[in-house]
Each structure stands twice: as structure tokens, then as C-alpha cells.
């Protein structure tokens, strides 16, 4: 054998690298075992190994070839527990052919077999599942050799050679092994129907083709840097079939398959019935190989590894197989630091997204084909990211924002206030998220739902809608969402409003939910130490021009003040729900006009209810007509208001126009005033007169005036 050991310095360097790598995982000294021919290429491969089962196929030069030869290998029933220079071959029950020798070679006690093993430059190494266990614990000693992984010492410039393997071994012993096709390579596999063997032809690496996938990809960290951990579940025992069957076709996660898959021949893999029906005793293999670039522990960047966790047996579910990252590295990937960082972060995202959405995960890797595929990092970017990341983004417990450009987003845009636009889009996102999580994707466009159907959906929506973290909305937030949806319908011109009597049943559900939230302390009202305005404070507001009818803002602030004082409106919700028809201009028995809050719009759904006054506003000219509550309210309701907003069901508080010139008599937009702006009116008044703790001033902070008629008195 020594006469044939002619090799190049490069291959010798690779052997030394493997020996160093082997020394990091095993204390036994490897020695030369036997020689294998390389098929059509004719190059020899010397196999080095130790008694623990670690093996390395060392390529030799063409000078060792002594004529045409056929590949000869040992039987699968072999043992690595001997330190002898050769491997003991044990004939199997299925082989009766005598021992054949290499033509023109000395006999080395090699046995022919009907199944050959690949000895390409990707060196296969194998070891027992546990070093403290004997190999005899396996039912078949060939199961020990079936547990193989791809070494890294000859990965970078290797040529692939034909190999013959049992499909049962592939599916049973290597369900999750990621092949060297992750190196920017392409692999084609062919099926040889003769003797039910599968011949796998590996071609020189060019571009990344297809990749095996494994379930539950997640990111782990180790001593050598970040590592990609790919977890594969145990494969169930194959069933006996009467004819050739396809092994390893169970479907796995679809999203990751598109980015990481391996291509099989269309004919599939066939196996003999006798091979499939043979009893199987599965063990968990644990093999660790070091990278050829491995240096001292302090070196960083060359020691990144990919750990593949493949529980093959239920008895040892925690055993792992580790594969160095260099075995999965693209040519020239050392310069692509950004791509490596991306790959180190993406798998955990793919895993968390896919596992959470998949009710069950099969245990066989999905094998699919893709003829043209970009490099690995772009493939994962365009495939896994696009399919796994949902169409909306989230920040902690913030509600999702859908990244959809459509007409509904345009309907949310407000030319009056950016806060209104933000609140309307928020309401739209809440509705879309609720539809998607409740199997109602066809109803995400609220403008295309008929009124009757929308009323039914809203009945369920008000009761079941939650935040993205599963908690309930505050009562004020639920009100704002309802107003936002109604604003979208109005801008779309659908011809109905969700606050109308057509939606009475859904409105009833909303009130019930608001009552529950209020009882649970989730009304949304701020807990404040209420501070009251003094008479001098109010006088200062008049003198500073904060109150009056000089501008849209001052007139609106004055109306809010008088409604709070005279019409008994003390909460933000009462002001927000106020409609134009809820305040009526009436006359008393003395024929004196006055404004009264009758809530006539709210009473439409109440049959037989009598008119009740919650307060009255009369003419009061003791301090001049510029401070008369009746005159100022009249101006707001009948002079400076848009004519289209003088209907009974129009919102009472409108957004003030910002243009100081060319406003004419109309000072307000045809749009409801936002909650935030309405809530800030009173604190802003306190701020303008330089009072402390401005946020503690509310609608009840105004001085309560005496009324000619008590509250809740009947109107004539």
C-alpha cells in the first residue's frame, strides 16, 4: 500500500488539517485503514480512521492508478473498533459474491458489495452516538457508519464523485444533514433502478442550487461565535410496502423550503421491500468536526459554526450533530461580512414565525427543485423574509401598522389635522388586524361591506377586539376607533353611518363593553387632582383674548366653557358624543328664547321618552354682549358653522380652520374635532394665563353658575 501513497502537498496539508481537527474531538490516534478507487475518474482515496469510528477519505494523485479499476469498498457490516491497519469485512446475508481484487494490485482483504459508498473530497466522518457506549448496542453495525457528516478539510476545492447509497440510510440516518450545496453549489441526483439502488451524482460546485431544510431553525451562540442551530424532529419508522416506495417526501415548513431546499431527480428514490421492512434500531449520532480555518480560541470570524441538532431517536432526544460553518460557506464569502451577519439573525426569525403559525410539523425534510436561484443571502432575503414576515410591523405592545398602499389609506388622510389622520389610520389598522386574526380577510375593506353585514360584524368586533398583546382597549380608545371607522365610511361616501339607528344592535354591544371596561377601571379617564378656576382666572382669560369671538379657536373655547358651566357637561365623553341636534333653541312660557341640552338625537331610539333638559342658556348681557353665553353659542351654531353640518346628527364640535384670512363667515371644517384636541382645550386655557399644573384642569374646573331652572327639569 505504501507504494501507492503518492499525493500532492495540498492534499497532504488537508490530511494534516483533518488530523488536527480530529485531535480536538478525539484522543485516539488515526491510522491508514484501506484504499478506495474513485470510479470513472480513477483517482484513489485512502481512508484514515481511528478505533472510535472517525474516518477521513484522503484523495491521492493519478500516479497511484494502475489501470482501469472499479470502485471497491467494504461491506456495510464493518467495525471500526479495531486498531489494525485494515477493516474487518463481514459478509451480509444478502451477498454471496466472492472476494474480488483490484486488477494489478495486491490483495488487501477487501470485499465486494452491491452497495458502494461515496468517497468524494467531501470527507465523511462517523463516530458512535456516545463514546462510552459499545457498538454492539446497535442492531446492525452498519448503522454506525451510516451516521455520517460532511467534514470541512476538503470542502473548498473538491470534485464530487458518484456514490451509491441506500435510500433507507438517507432517510433514516441523515434526515437533517445540510449537504455541501450550501457552498454555492449545484447537485443533481439520479435514480438507478437496477438492484433498487440510488446513485447520487454530485457535480462540481458552481452556484447554489437547492438546499435541504430542517424544522425549527433558531439562532444559538457558542464559544466560536454565533451559530445557526437547525433542529430536526425524529423520523417515524418506515412502513413496509409491497413495491418500491419514495422515502423522504413528507412536507415540511413551506416558507423555509423555498429558500433552503435540495433537488431530487423527478423519478424519486426507490428502495427494495426487503430493505424497507428490515427492523430498525435508531440511535442518535453526535459528531463534531472542526473547521480547517480553525485557530486559537481567540481568533474571531473564522470559527463560526453551524450546529445541527438532529434527534434521531426518542431515547436520546438531546444529542446533536455539529457541522462547521465553513462547510456551508460560499466561495469568497469571507469578504461578505454583512451576509454572514444576516444569516446569523434570520433563522430565528423564520423559526419563530413559522412554528407559531404551523399547527404541526412533519419530521421529513422537504426536497424541492429550483433551477435558477440567486446566492444564499439574497435567496433568504427574497423568499423567507417575504413569506414569513407579515404585512404589518409591530413594536413591543404597539398596535400593528399594515404596510398596504391602497385607497383606504387615502380615505384616512385629513387635510385639517395630522392627529386626525393618525387616529383614523390607527382605527383602520385595528379593523384589518381583527379581520385577519378572525378569519375574515375578505372583509378588511370596510367600505365594501353592506350595512346589515357590517352591523353583524361590529357586534362581534366591539366585544372581541383586543390589542396586539391580547389586552383590552380603554373605553376612550374604543370610542376613537369607532369614530375613525365612521370617518372612513363618510369619506368613502357609502351613504350610511355606524352611529345611525341601522346599527342599533352593534351600538348596544358597544355600550355593554364600555360599561364592563368602566367597572374594570379601564374607562381611560385620567386620574387627576382637579383644580378649579377662580373668578380672577376667568377674568384674565377674557382680558388676554383667550375667550370671546375674535377667532375660531377662542369662540370654540368659549362654547366649551359655557357648555360645561350651564349644560352640566363635565366629562370628555359627554362633549365628544354631543350632536348638533342635542342642543335645541326653545322658548319658555314668557316667550324668552334659550338654548337647552335635550339629547334629542340620543332619545330617537327610546320610544315614549319625554324631553328632559340637562341645562339652559339664556341671554346674559350684564357684562356686555361679547360675553353673553347665548349670543356666542348662537354665533357658533348658526353663523360660523358650515351649512352641511347643521343637521341633527352632525357632530357638535368641529375642527377650527387654520387660515386666518379669506375664511369668510365659515370658520370650521366639515370634520369632527378630535378627542385629543377637545381634551386639550381647558389645559391650554390654563397655560395661556400661566397657571401651574395645567394638565389638572378639566371641564369641571370652570366656576359653576346658578341656573334659573334646576338640572333635569322638564322643558315646555
UniProtKB/Swiss-Prot annotation:
Keywords: Isopeptide bond, Phosphoprotein, Ubl conjugation. Signal peptide: none annotated. InterPro entries: DUF3504, KIAA1958. There is a cross-link at residues 201, 204, 237, 283, 626 (Glycyl lysine isopeptide (Lys-Gly) (interchain with G-Cter in SUMO2)). Pfam families: DUF3504. The modification Phosphoserine is found at residue 97. Residues 84-103, 153-189 are annotated as: Disordered. The keyword Kinase does not apply. Disulfide bonds: none annotated. This is Uncharacterized protein KIAA1958. It comes from Homo sapiens. The gene is KIAA1958.
Amino acid at each position: 500500500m505504501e507504494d501507492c501513497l503518492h499525493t500532492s502537498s495540498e492534499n497532504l496539508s488537508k490530511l494534516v488539517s483533518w488530523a488536527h481537527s480530529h485531535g480536538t474531538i478525539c484522543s485516539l490516534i488515526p491510522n491508514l485503514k484501506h484504499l478506495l478507487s474513485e470510479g470513472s475518474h480513477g483517482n484513489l482515496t485512502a481512508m484514515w480512521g481511528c478505533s472510535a469510528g472517525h474516518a477521513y477519505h484522503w484523495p491521492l494523485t493519478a500516479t497511484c492508478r494502475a489501470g482501469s479499476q472499479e470502485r471497491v469498498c467494504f461491506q456495510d457490516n464493518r467495525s471500526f473498533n479495531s486498531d489494525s491497519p485494515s477493516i474487518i469485512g463481514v459478509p451480509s446475508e444478502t451477498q454471496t459474491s466472492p472476494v474480488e481484487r483490484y486488477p494489478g494490485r495486491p490483495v488487501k482483504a477487501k470485499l465486494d458489495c452491491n452497495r458502494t459508498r461515496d468517497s468524494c473530497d467531501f470527507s465523511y466522518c462517523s463516530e458512535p452516538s456516545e463514546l462510552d457506549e459499545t457498538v454492539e448496542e446497535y442492531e446492525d453495525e452498519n448503522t454506525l457508519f451510516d451516521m455520517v457528516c460532511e467534514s470541512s478539510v476538503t470542502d473548498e476545492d473538491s470534485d464530487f464523485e458518484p456514490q451509491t447509497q441506500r435510500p433507507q440510510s438517507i432517510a433514516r440516518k441523515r434526515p437533517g444533514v445540510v449537504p455541501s450545496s450550501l457552498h454555492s453549489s449545484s447537485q443533481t441526483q439520479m435514480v438507478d433502478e437496477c438492484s433498487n439502488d440510488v446513485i447520487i451524482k454530485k457535480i462540481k460546485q458552481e452556484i447554489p442550487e437547492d438546499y435541504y431544510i430542517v424544522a425549527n431553525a433558531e439562532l444559538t451562540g457558542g464559544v466560536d461565535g454565533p451559530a445557526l442551530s437547525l433542529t430536526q424532529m425524529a423520523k417515524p419508522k418506515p412502513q413496509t410496502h409491497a413495491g418500491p416506495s419514495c422515502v423522504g417526501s413528507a412536507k415540511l415548513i413551506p416558507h423555509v423550503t423555498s429558500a433552503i431546499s435540495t433537488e431530487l431527480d423527478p423519478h424519486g428514490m426507490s428502495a427494495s421491500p426487503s430493505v424497507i421492512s428490515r427492523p430498525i434500531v435508531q440511535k442518535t449520532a453526535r459528531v463534531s468536526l472542526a473547521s480547517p480555518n480553525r485557530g486559537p480560541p481567540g481568533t474571531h470570524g473564522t470559527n463560526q459554526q453551524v450546529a445541527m441538532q438532529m434527534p434521531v431517536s426518542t431515547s436520546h432526544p438531546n444529542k446533536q450533530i455539529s457541522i462547521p460553518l465553513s462547510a456551508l460557506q460560499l466561495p469568497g464569502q469571507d469578504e461578505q461580512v454583512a451576509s454572514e451577519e444576516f444569516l446569523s439573525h434570520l433563522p430565528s426569525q423564520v423559526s419563530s414565525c413559522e412554528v407559531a403559525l404551523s399547527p404541526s410539523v412533519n419530521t421529513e425534510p422537504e426536497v424541492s427543485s429550483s433551477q435558477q436561484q440567486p446566492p444564499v443571502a439574497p435567496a433568504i432575503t427574497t423568499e423567507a423574509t417575504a413569506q414569513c414576515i407579515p404585512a404589518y410591523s409591530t413594536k413591543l405592545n404597539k398596535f400593528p401598522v399594515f404596510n398596504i398602499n391602497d385607497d383606504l389609506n387615502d380615505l384616512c388622510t385629513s387635510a385639517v389635522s395630522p392627529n386626525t389622520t393618525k387616529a383614523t389610520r390607527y382605527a383602520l389598522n385595528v379593523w384589518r388586524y381583527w379581520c385577519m386574526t378572525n378569519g375574515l380577510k375578505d372583509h378588511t375593506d370596510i367600505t365594501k361591506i353592506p350595512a346589515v353585514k357590517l352591523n353583524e360584524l361590529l357586534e362581534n368586533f366591539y366585544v372581541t377586539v383586543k390589542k396586539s398583546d391580547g389586552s383590552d382597549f380603554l373605553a376612550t380608545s374604543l370610542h376613537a376607533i369607532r369614530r375613525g371607522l365612521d370617518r372612513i365610511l363618510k369619506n368613502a361616501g357609502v351613504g350610511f353611518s355606524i352611529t345611525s339607528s341601522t346599527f342599533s344592535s352593534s351600538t348596544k354591544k358597544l355600550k355593554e363593553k364600555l360599561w364592563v371596561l368602566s367597572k374594570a377601571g379601564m374607562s381611560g379617564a385620567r386620574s387627576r387632582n382637579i383644580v378649579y378656576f377662580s373668578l380672577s382666572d376667568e377674568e384674565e382669560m377674557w382680558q388676554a383674548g383667550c375667550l370671546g369671538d375674535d377667532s375660531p379657536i377662542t369662540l370654540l373655547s368659549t362654547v366649551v366653557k359655557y357648555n360645561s358651566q350651564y349644560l352640566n357637561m363635565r366629562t370628555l365623553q359627554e362633549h365628544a358624543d354631543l350632536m348638533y341636534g342635542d342642543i335645541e333653541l326653545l322658548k319658555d312660557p314668557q316667550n324668552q328664547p334659550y338654548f337647552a341640552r335635550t339629547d334629542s338625537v340620543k332619545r330617537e331610539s327610546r320610544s315614549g321618552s319625554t324631553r328632559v333638559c340637562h341645562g339652559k342658556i339664556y341671554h346674559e348681557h350684564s357684562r356686555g354682549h361679547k360675553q353673553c353665553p347665548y349670543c356666542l353659542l348662537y354665533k357658533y351654531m348658526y353663523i360660523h358653522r358650515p351649512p352641511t353640518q347643521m343637521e341633527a346628527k352632525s357632530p357638535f364640535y368641529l375642527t377650527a380652520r387654520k387660515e386666518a384670512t379669506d375664511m369668510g363667515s365659515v370658520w370650521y371644517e366639515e370634520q369632527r374635532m378630535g378627542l385629543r384636541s377637545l381634551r386639550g382645550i381647558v389645559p391650554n386655557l390654563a397655560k395661556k394665563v400661566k397657571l401651574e399644573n395645567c394638565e389638572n384642569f378639566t371641564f369641571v374646573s370652570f366656576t359653576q353658575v346658578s341656573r334659573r331652572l334646576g338640572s333635569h327639569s322638564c322643558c315646555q
